[in-house]
Amino acid sequence: MDGAHSAGLQLQPLPPTSGATSTSLSSSEGSFSYKENLIGALLAIFGHLVVSIALNLQKYCHIRLAGSKDPRAYFKTKTWWLGLLLLLLGELGVFASYAFAPLSLIVPLSAVSVIASAIIGIIFIKEKWKPKDFVRRYVLSFVGCGLAIVGTYLLVTFAPNSHEKMTGENIARHLVSWPFLLYMLVAIVLFCLLLYFYKERNANSIVVILLLVALLGSMTVVTVKAVSGMLVLSIQGNLQLDYPIFYVMFVCMVATAIYQATFLSEASQIYDSSLIASVGYILSTTAAITAGAIFYLDFLGEEALHICMFALGCLIAFLGVFLITRNRKKAIPFEPYISMDAMPGMQDMHAKGTTVQPDLKASFSYGALESNDSISELYTPATLPVMQEEHSSRSTPGVPYRVLEHTKKE
């Protein structure tokens, strides 16, 4: 009986202990957070790649229409409009990436656009460098691309796994937290000091201007993540648009982005674009990561090794971007003056003693702001010896040409 009764007994599984439950929950949460990080990183990489392609398409269109008389001829080309659509698509991808991954991961991934621009500029735009500059330019550029890729890999691998729902309550709670209020106080004081020295003391250093951009940019990315996260939650069914904090963040996002673009435009009028790209990337990324770590607590609970490896990835990406941008060709400024000896046929005119006459009926007076419609002056010719150019061996020395001497009629 006992054997039959014992045979009929079935072992019941024991309920899981609290330790096992917490372990399984933490592993599932870790897997979910890693998937969200991967989705956000892929969206950001895709967005920056598409933005790079779009900007190079528009650059290619402007290069082809450089000699056009119509200053807005690019509006009539399909290439420029395709670039504009790709630009909007890329920016939308970058905007959506902030809703999935931490801010500290998305911001440094803008190095992808620098890598893509360097490669597309060589292949698509066909930027040509002299063979003697190959070692100085190509090798350093490829080394920079390699370092930027390694840095990007470290950023994605050791990125923080903080994933808090961007609800109106959470954002309002972070906005009035003491760490962020202290950061805002320091940022506002520093911004006012830099703005004073820039506007009143003419401190036009690139570090001063780009620090202004970086401080504004840190607030831009904080508000972008809030707006993007609240929009994604609203699309998923958890409506967040009825919170006033959404509109506060939206207004701050637009305002800081506009002023940031203004300072960048002023910097581009003084400094080379490659220098702005490298210094701006370093300063803006550092300020944005700092703001994200304080506002969204990105690194709260992270291991020290992960934080150090993430910082190492940032430093490697900084070095890669610097190497890529430091050897770009500087734009040659437009030179409105033409050497007379460089014009075809001018040497033959000098040899024959032909006078170079100005066009008196033209509406443009070279070197003066006078109208040539009514001419009542008397011109008497004078002669000067021709100066032989050092670079021209075909010019004939000693042959005079006449320069018109201007005297008023009495």
Curated annotation (Swiss-Prot):
Short name of one Pfam family: Mg_trans_NIPA
Tagged with keyword Membrane: yes
Region annotation (Disordered) ranges: 1-24, 389-410
Chain segments annotated as transmembrane: 37-57, 80-100, 105-125, 139-159, 175-195, 206-226, 244-264, 275-295, 304-324
Membrane topology summary: Multi-pass membrane protein
Entry-linked InterPro entries: Mg_trans_NIPA
Protein's UniProt name: NIPA-like protein 3
Species annotation: Mus musculus (Mouse)
Gene: Nipal3
